[in-house]
């Protein structure tokens, strides 16, 4: 049986403005972390562990459930802008000054809006199979 950091790292919880975000941190906790933003109908268990584990060999990786998704509480926003705002609040709640964002599909739209709305928070974007963001 193959074990994965993405699935064996403990799920933690962070309370931010009435939302309890579920997340996992793993890899090398030095430097700027890589935060994965969710694709449509996804949660922190839906990212390919082969990819997240490979990236975690050289840096810290953070997977999370956005508001109202998976193990996180709150109400899932009905807009990409709302999802981006919640994701930005989560990143702020972790106390990160800067992060690299990896977004696939809808997660790419979320990541782009965070970068547009909060350029101070985003160092780099990795966009996979996504298009321009919808507000």
Where are these regions (language model features)?
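N-terminal cap/lid segment of alpha/beta-hydrolase-fold proteins
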Residues: 2-20
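Conserved HGGG/HGGXW glycine-rich cap/lid loop of the alpha/beta-hydrolase fold
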Residues: 16-73
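Alpha-helical elements of Rossmann-like donor-binding domains used by nucleotide-donor carbohydrate transfer enzymes
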Residues: 9, 46, 50, 82-89
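Conserved hydrolase catalytic core segment
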Residues: 97-135
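Short, well-ordered alpha-helices that flank and scaffold nucleotide-derived cofactor binding pockets
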Residues: 53, 57, 89, 116-120
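Active-site loop/oxyanion-hole signature of alpha/beta-hydrolase fold enzymes
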Residues: 62-102
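Flexible, active-site-proximal loop/turn residues at the rims of small-molecule/cofactor binding pockets
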Residues: 41, 46, 76, 81, ...
